[in-house]
Amino acid sequence: MMTAVKQSGVWAVLLWPYLLAVSIQLDCRDEQGNMSRCPFISQEKLLDRIIQHAELISRISEESCSLFEELFVPFPLRLQRNTVGYACITKALPIPSSKSEIQQISDKWLLQSVLTLVQSWIEPLVYLQTTLDRYDNAPDVLLNKTKWVSEKLVSLEQGVVVLIRKMLDEGTLTTTYNEQDLLQYDVLPDMLESVMRDYTLLSCFKKDAHKMEIFLKLLKCRQTDKFNCA
């Protein structure tokens, strides 16, 4: 198994500069911190950039989760992340989950669901950086991937906020972070508990990142072919 991990790590190192080079820029803030860049992009192009951004975040989060699992999580413990003690922090959020629910919600709620998910993960991913730094043998490629995702999630939030303003004419929209579950991170757990908690975070974020991607692609489909969006 370690040979496979090493090989995947080698490929990740080789491909990482390429992924950074081809990643879509979505930094809406200027040097003064004002979101003055994205408003000058057309709604269609902005949505395309956001989707490409979300696709890459989803892909890198999946790679990070798989690498972490192979390196640190013994096989008998991999199913425990689905138990009550390791519930996803976004489980209680009013996010549509079934296909029928997703199909029925409005464009506004699709965007609001994406924004809610993005904002709910910004602080937990910052926390994840501090815990991964304590691992003695965490490879740089894992640390770099999680750091990149954490940074790009903030850019994705900025893009979604501007898109909401463009599509829904909600110029006074403000962003708020969901901190309802962050207090559980105040006490540092022992190493095994920390591994399982980090594994849960990565696994849950992987699923939510995929959900963001699906919502955004459905929104794009509704803009182009409203009656044939499955």
UniProtKB/Swiss-Prot annotation:
Molecular function terms, GO-annotated: growth hormone activity; growth hormone receptor binding
Cited InterPro entries: 4_helix_cytokine-like_core, Somatotropin/Prolactin, Somatotropin_CS
Subcellular location: Secreted
Signal peptide: 1-23
Disulfide bonds: 28-38, 88-204, 221-229
Expression sites (tissue/organ): Pituitary gland.
Pfam families noted in UniProt: Hormone_1
Keyword tags: Disulfide bond, Glycoprotein, Hormone, Secreted, Signal
Coiled-coil region(s): none
UniProt keyword annotation of Chloroplast present: no
GO cellular component terms given for this protein: extracellular space
Sugar-modified residues: 34, 144
Listed GO biological process terms: animal organ development; growth hormone receptor signaling pathway; positive regulation of growth; positive regulation of receptor signaling pathway via JAK-STAT; response to nutrient levels
Sequence similarity: Belongs to the somatotropin/prolactin family.
Protein name per Swiss-Prot or TrEMBL: Somatolactin
Biological source species: Solea senegalensis (Senegalese sole)
